[in-house]
């Protein structure tokens, strides 16, 4: 082999090696949608969903894709919302308690960008600085499980006591519908009342079921809002939960706590499928892929949509 050929071959091998060591697991592909509406329902375990009382969610499920997914262990809130927004496993994001305000175990240095783990909001900001994003939530822990300063709009709706969650969740919808005027690439509507009333009265109780019904009414408002904003044909709806429950508790190692609903719906996903098993860690990578953005290697979840 001539020297020039050897040099060319070595250069090609080096290039492949460099690509393999890239910070990005997937190269960007053409987006399939312009917008993702993410609905996060705390404590909404798949085994506890009163489908016959939730027509709006049922319509999204029946008109789209559905999988019974799995969350991370322990089956608690901060651990699993971090799993969803950072798109990675507990061993990487390091959140270990239900109310962790920051990683309890330092994330691997190789996974950090600017000293922090990349989340779905920070990746959109990094790759597309002009994109508008919004995150709205009633449990303050949500703000600690994502890089809220990367979102164009972030608001926590505080209030005292378990019974304050239903009106606060409604406030999330009220403000979120206003945010649709900005045509956000990604908007999070978080709902906390299902978890709150599950703790207060038990998963599967009448008050728990009533909370699910109210959340379904809020989902209906979101759907109508997307239509009125002229975003319907270009929007993917995604609904996930952080955990289920049993009695008045969660954090347990059983399917009542592990199994969560994953709904992906909208015109852009017609003819597609979800690759199972779907994990909660797949949330952020799937959203980034839908919008045509790169998925960083730090996100150990995968794009679950094919």
Where is each model-derived feature located?
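Active-site nucleophile/metal-coordination loop of metallo-enzymes that catalyze phosphate/sulfate
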Residues: 26-33, 45-126
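Loop/turn elements at helix/coil->beta-strand transitions in domains of secreted/extracellular proteins
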Residues: 32-36, 63-66, 127-134, 182-187, ...
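Metal-dependent active-site segment of extracytoplasmic phospho-/sulfohydrolases and closely related
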Residues: 38, 56, 211-255, 287
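Active-site rim elements
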Residues: 69, 107-111, 208-209, 269-277
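Substrate-binding rim/cap in mid-to-C-terminal beta-strand-loop elements of soluble/periplasmic
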Residues: 85, 253-294, 305
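Catalytic-site neighborhoods of secreted/periplasmic enzymes
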Residues: 93-97, 112-165
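Active-site His/acidic residue clusters
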Residues: 141-158, 174-217, 221
């Amino acid at each position: 082999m001539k020297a020039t050929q050897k040099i060319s071959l070595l250069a090609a091998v080096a290039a492949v090696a460099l690509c393999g060591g890239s910070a990005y697991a997937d190269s960007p592909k053409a987006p399939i949608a312009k917008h993702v509406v993410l609905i996060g329902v705390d404590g909404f375990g798949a085994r506890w969903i009163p489908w016959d009382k939730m027509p709006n969610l049922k319509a999204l499920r029946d008109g789209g894709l559905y999988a019974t997914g799995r969350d991370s262990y322990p089956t608690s809130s901060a651990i699993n919302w971090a799993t969803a927004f950072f798109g990675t496993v507990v061993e990487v994001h390091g959140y270990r308690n239900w109310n962790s305000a920051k990683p309890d175990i330092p994330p691997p240095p190789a996974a950090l960008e600017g000293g922090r783990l990349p989340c779905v909001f920070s990746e959109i900001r990094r790759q597309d600085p002009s994109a508008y994003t919004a995150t709205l939530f009633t449990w303050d822990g949500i703000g600690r499980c994502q890089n809220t300063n990367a979102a164009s709009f972030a608001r926590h709706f505080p209030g005292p006591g378990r019974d304050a969650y239903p009106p606060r969740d409604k406030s999330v919808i009220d403000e979120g519908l206003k945010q649709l005027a900005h045509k956000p690439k990604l908007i999070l509507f978080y709902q906390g009342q299902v978890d709150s009333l599950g703790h207060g009265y038990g998963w599967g109780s009448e008050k728990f079921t009533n909370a699910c019904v109210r959340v379904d009414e809020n989902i209906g408002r979101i759907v109508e809002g997307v239509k009125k904003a002229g975003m319907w044909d270009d929007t993917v709806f995604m609904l996930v939960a952080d955990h289920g429950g049993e009695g008045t508790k969660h954090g347990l190692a059983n399917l009542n706590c592990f199994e969560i609903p994953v709904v992906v719906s909208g015109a852009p996903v017609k003819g597609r499928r979800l690759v199972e098993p779907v994990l909660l860690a797949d949330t952020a990578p799937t959203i980034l892929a839908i919008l045509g953005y790169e998925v960083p290697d730090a996100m150990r979840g995968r794009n679950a949509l094919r």
